[in-house]
Regions:
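Signature of Gram-negative outer-membrane beta-barrel scaffolds
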Residues: 2-125, 140, 145-150, 252
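Outer-membrane beta-barrel signature, preferentially recognizing the C-terminal barrel domain
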Residues: 108-109, 138-191, 200-229, 268-281, ...
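Residues on the lipid-exposed face of transmembrane beta-strands in outer-membrane beta-barrel proteins
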Residues: 63-69, 82, 118-122, 170-174, ...
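Transmembrane beta-strands of outer-membrane beta-barrel pores
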Residues: 3, 71-73, 82-88, 134-140, ...
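Repeated loop/turn-to-beta-strand initiation elements of outer-membrane beta-barrel proteins
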Residues: 73-76, 127-130, 178-181, 233-236, ...
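C-terminal beta-signal and adjacent terminal beta-strands/loops
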Residues: 302-330, 345, 356-430
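Outer-membrane beta-barrel translocator domains and adjoining extracellular loop/strand segments
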Residues: 5-14, 88-97, 143-151, 193-202, ...
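Gram-negative outer-membrane beta-barrel transporters
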Residues: 187-189, 207-314, 427-429
Length: 430
């Protein structure tokens, strides 16, 4: 507890659960071992720990092997790795919702991991080269996604397995007197992916813990880089990336609301949802002047296809059925019609830098000024997320859903790039 905002103490109880259980019910306690003499929860003061207290322990061992050889114009490499991952949770509080499954050490999750990768490059002559890379890997899930609700209990996520990753890349390089070029394409496929989120779920007036499992993902794209040597001191570079990073199927979901001790299973209709908060298309042009100790660079960058983090709760099967055809959750044929993922606004950004190196009698002085977003374009979205709040309310008597006055889906949280900003760096070497 950092600041009680004027209060003297705070009861260590689950305030979300008070709407479901009475204040004296042990299930509202965050720690049954410190409920106090009246059973109202330990009094928390500034500097105390409350709500949850746990440690996640990970033990990992890896062994690598690598072999490389050059035969004429062919250079190739083969590498392999095997590993072992062990993880478990140690709870320092006995949660009232999970009295027998929150304090102490959890069960262990063990994963045998490993993978192989290879790369081959053929020199074709005349500055041309062709490369191919392939890889396959079994990777243990991250510890921060392995537990279903770590703030409340020791449960691991159901269907927790190694992620399986196939990767491939094909590239062409050219190096000449006035031009250097690189063209590459890649395709990666992942299965058994597990993702985890926790957030305040307005529909249930509760904090919620969401685990999505059995996910499949595709990552693919093309990249082009050109470097033109216009003169001995002037270069022009053109860079372009078009990529795709999205879910290939609808995920299984299990979630727990902090007002109850029961899990809910469903399908989240998140197929074709994209990776968030990164531009999937980037195009750049850079002009560089380097002469007589001067360094001047002017860079123009265009960013596009920037998606916000999607809210799984808006795409649960149960949510779409509740919305029905009247509120757009299903079409007339009974097919689910989940929301499209919210996309942020891209745009153009101009950056510049100028520097000078001076050689002195007893050292050297380097001065560099960098200015970002020279045109002060603050309309570019750098990231954000959809609100996990539905656009309807449900009549508890009739079960009918009606539209809310405020449309949460159309008003997501967005982050924007900073306006014009700069940095001056002065370094003296001796």
């Amino acid at each position: 507890m950092e600041d009680l905002l004027g209060a003297k103490s705070f009861h260590n109880i689950n305030t979300y659960a008070l709407g479901t259980y009475a204040a004296a019910d042990p299930r509202v306690q965050y720690d049954l071992n410190t409920t106090g003499t009246l059973g109202l929860g330990k009094l928390v003061y500034e500097g105390d720990t409350f709500g949850y207290d746990y440690n996640i322990n990970v033990r990992r061992a890896k062994l690598w092997a690598n072999y490389a050889q050059t035969i004429g114009k062919l250079h190739y490499m083969v590498a392999g790795r095997v590993g072992y991952d062990n993880m478990y949770r140690v709870g320092n509080m006995r949660n009232g919702m999970f009295a027998d499954n929150s304090a102490g050490k959890s069960k262990d999750a063990n994963f045998l991991t490993g993978g192989v990768k290879s790369n081959a490059t053929v020199t074709l002559g005349g500055g041309n080269a062709l490369s191919l890379g392939l890889g396959y890997e079994h990777r243990a899930p991250n510890a921060n996604t392995a537990f279903a609700s770590p703030e409340m209990n020791n449960d691991f996520v159901l269907n927790l397995h190694n992620e399986r990753i196939f990767s491939s890349e094909l590239s062409y390089q050219y190096s000449g007197s006035w031009l250097r070029a690189n063209l590459s394409g890649y395709y990666n496929h992942m299965t058994n992916v597990t993702e985890w989120q926790n957030f305040y779920f307005d529909d249930a007036n509760s904090f919620t813990y969401v685990s999505m499992t059995n996910m499949k993902k595709n990552y693919y794209g093309i990249e082009l880089g050109l470097d033109f040597k216009l003169t001995s001191f002037l270069n022009f570079k053109a860079l372009g990336t078009w990529s795709e990073a999205k879910n290939a199927n609808n995920a299984d979901v299990i979630y727990l609301n902090s007002t109850k001790s029961t899990y809910n299973k469903d399908i989240v209709y998140n197929k074709n949802m994209h990776e968030a908060s990164t531009p999937l298309s980037v195009y750049s042009a850079i002009l560089s002047y380097h002469k007589g100790g001067w360094f001047i660079d002017l860079s123009g960058n265009y960013y596009d296809r920037i998606y916000l983090s999607y809210a799984p709760s808006l795409r649960y099967g149960n949510t779409l059925r509740t919305m029905g055809t009247a509120l757009g959750g299903m079409d007339a044929n009974g097919n689910y019609t989940p929301y499209a993922q919210t996309e942020g606004h891209g745009g153009f950004m101009l950056d510049a830098s100028i520097g000078k190196s001076l050689y002195l009698r007893h050292g050297s002085l380097s001065i560099n000024l960098m200015i970002t977003n020279l045109l002060n374009n603050q309309k570019i979205v750098s990231g954000g997320y959809e609100q996990g709040r539905s656009n309807y309310t449900v009549n508890k008597t009739t079960g009918a859903a009606t539209t809310r006055a405020y449309d949460f889906y159309r008003n997501p949280k967005k982050y924007y790039v900073n306006g014009i900003n700069g940095m001056l760096n002065v370094a003296y070497k001796f």
